[in-house]
Amino acid sequence: MACCADEGYYCETSLRSGTFLIDWFIQQMLKIDTNHKPEIYRQLEEEAQQVEPGSEGLMILPYWNAVMNPYWDPDARGCIIGLTSGHNRGHFYRAILEGIAMEQSLATKAVEKAVGQRTDEFALIGGGAKSNLWRQIIADTSGKKVLTMSSDEASSLGAGISAAVAAGWFHSFVEAAQNMVHVKGITEPDSQNAERYNNQLFKYRKIYPAIREIYKPGI
């Protein structure tokens, strides 16, 4: 997609069931109204932090609303793999976060291959960026450092940067961004966890090809 800055393009990837899946799990599986019990997010976060990376074999393919990149399959369906009686809601919550992070890793690898450049870091915004656990999972699954920004509203900030350049306050988008975008924190990948997730990603990426013929229409 063309960039509004001086030159160049940016690559966009999209997961149709991102944080939506967390709310779906809480509302539909746990039967909890987050409006009446907002502390459930903190409780699940604490429970999931007690679970080892990899969720003791529980893996979730987060295709509840089909999948865009990397497969672009409107018929794709979500999948829960490796469920045992030893798993609890903390495992499920962590497995959801890990599944979304795995998808981000696959999308990033595809972009890096397409453009021939390496991604060094991620900048997180929005509600998910407030989760210490999720930031660490993203860092560990990708092997890249994760930045949290001082502003959660990237769209508004981007509009402000564009307006500042148009008004002549800055000579370029680069200069405007350097003055208006600020990093609040950095999460570094854990080397041991990164190795475990790298092994899990090898298994994870086999799930979709293995099950896609099961749910295809007419089969």
Map each language-model feature to its residues.
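Active-site core segments that coordinate phosphate-bearing ligands/cofactors
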Residues: 1-125, 129-219
